[in-house]
């Protein structure tokens, strides 16, 4: 079975490395970027199945990048990876077209499930997110 192609957008190098290490076993990590503009460019060159995106990227935020990709009918599914444990952020993420919302502190348990569900067209939010 073909591994899902995942692109990681995270501006903190240590977190980016941890995400790649976590995902490399079961997914084809086709690239990493550290800002929203680079994410928009990389989507077209790497054609990922799923994007794992930090909500607070520099240059263009993750929310803004997701909104742009949604308007462009980008086929890649989006999973946000964030420290923001707040219902308003979750709503903004879903409004921008994301199917997944994973807290960084739950990454090892929640991110693989969120990626798989997003690829299947299903929503996933870390269970510990408040008031959703």
Segments the model singles out, each with a brief description of its role:
Residues 53, 58, 82:
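The feature encodes the CheY-like receiver
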Residues 12-31:
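Two-component/phosphorelay signaling modules centered on CheY-like receiver
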Residues 32, 57-60:
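Residue-level signal for the "D+5" position in two-component response regulator receiver
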Residues 63-75:
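Short amphipathic alpha-helix used as the core "switch/output" element in two-component signaling
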Residues 32-50:
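Acidic, metal-coordinating helix/loop segments flanking the phosphotransfer/catalytic sites
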Residues 90-95, 100-132:
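Short, flexible helix-to-coil linker/hinge segments that flank and couple to helix-turn-helix
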Residues 35, 61-64:
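Acidic catalytic/metal-coordinating carboxylates
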């Amino acid at each position: 079975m073909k591994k899902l192609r995942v692109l990681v957008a995270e501006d903190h190098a240590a977190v980016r490395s941890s995400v790649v290490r976590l995902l490399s076993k079961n997914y084809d990590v086709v690239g990493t970027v550290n800002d929203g503009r680079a994410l928009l460019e990389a989507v077209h060159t790497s054609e990922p199945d799923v994007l794992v995106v930090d909500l607070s990227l520099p240059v263009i935020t993750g929310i803004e990048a997701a909104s742009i990709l949604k308007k462009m009918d980008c086929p890649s599914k989006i999973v946000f990876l964030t420290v923001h444990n707040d219902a308003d952020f979750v709503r903004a993420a879903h409004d921008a077209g994301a199917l997944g919302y994973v807290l960084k502190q739950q990454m090892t348990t929640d991110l693989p499930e969120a990626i798989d569900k997003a690829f299947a067209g299903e929503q996933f939010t870390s269970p510990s997110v408040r008031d959703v």
